[in-house]
């Protein structure tokens, strides 16, 4: 029933329209679908065989991962704690997270300009028995170790 229809299709060498029937049109569609499926299969097989090339990183790549709720910056992970604690308790809390109080360095200064710049944090630096440094607005201030402040852990 459908195989008796004729369609204007391709143009031959003499620039005349060729008339195609249903069988020829269906054959052309099957050939095109076969080519598409074949190229996709070849691509999948190639990617499967050479997957190692896609997974390796160059040694120049600086890729690192931080735990959930930690902030990654310059190959260091920082944790901004929301609980105020004194210097000793803050140090112990960081140890429980397998980290230390953040060191007072340029990376931390740059990071605090972006995150929580108006808060006061303990950093890893003792002045003497009862004092340590705290960080606020990218500047360091001398504080009593017994004063409860927020703190930043790093690892």
From Swiss-Prot:
Glycans are attached at residues 82, 86, 98, 104, 110, 124, 130, 137. The keyword Plastid does not apply. It holds the Pfam family UL45. One of its GO terms (cellular component) is membrane. Residues 66-154 are annotated as: Lectin-like. GO terms for biological process: symbiont-mediated perturbation of host apoptosis. The chain crosses the membrane at residues 31-51. GO terms for molecular function: carbohydrate binding. It is a single-pass type II membrane protein. Residues 52-155 are extracellular. Keywords: Disulfide bond, Early protein, Glycoprotein, Host endoplasmic reticulum, Host membrane, Host-virus interaction, Late protein, Lectin, Membrane, Modulation of host cell apoptosis by virus, Signal-anchor, Transmembrane, Transmembrane helix. It is found in: Host endoplasmic reticulum membrane. Residues 1-30 are cytoplasmic. Induction: Expressed in the early phase of the viral replicative cycle. Expressed in the late phase of the viral replicative cycle. Homodimer. Belongs to the asfivirus lectin-like protein family. Down-regulates MHC-I expression by impairing the appropriate configuration or presentation into the plasma membrane of the latter. Participates in viral hemadsorption, which may help viral spread. Reduces the transactivating activity of host TP53, thus inhibiting apoptosis. Non-essential for virus growth in swine macrophage cell cultures. This is Lectin-like protein EP153R. It comes from African swine fever virus (isolate Tick/South Africa/Pretoriuskop Pr4/1996).
